Amino acid sequence: MIKRIIEDLDTALQKDPSARYRLEVALTFPGVHAVWGHRIAHLLWRRGFKLFARIYANWVRAVTGIEIHPAARIGRRFFIDHGMGVVIGETAEVGDDVMIYHDVTLGSRKYAKGKRHPTIGDRVVIGAGARILGPITVGEGARISANSVVTSDIPARTNQDESELFSI
């Protein structure tokens, strides 16, 4: 557990040029707090304490402004920069070394049972304000531009221009 905490702190130091040292990150970075909160809520969820997981996740959202459903699967070295307004849905899956900016939604497109949120591959970067909706896949190493609306699969190592992705 301590190794994972240090790994999360070091990830912030590597990905955010404003981060100067571990203590600063641990005390002042809401994205890191949300990831830690999610790891605890997810553990509770997996162990069958679903109500407590939801209550705890709601508390984390109130404190950080970041909503991650406790059932969502989040990989290692996940970093949320700034974070306010981030929403990650129940069936979302996020790979390792993923970075997202503020106001990103990994959401569903309609009410449905089963898989309804996106799967994000390893080493993906998602720009501020992006909306990735539905049970789609964003391939490994892809970069999603700010304010994009993505409703279909994105191949691995794709650097999408927002004009190619935005739909009304």
Predicted regions and their residues:
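Terminal amphipathic alpha-helical/low-complexity segments used for targeting or macromolecular assembly
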Residues: 1-64, 166-168
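Left-handed beta-helix
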Residues: 64, 69-70, 75-76, 81-90, ...
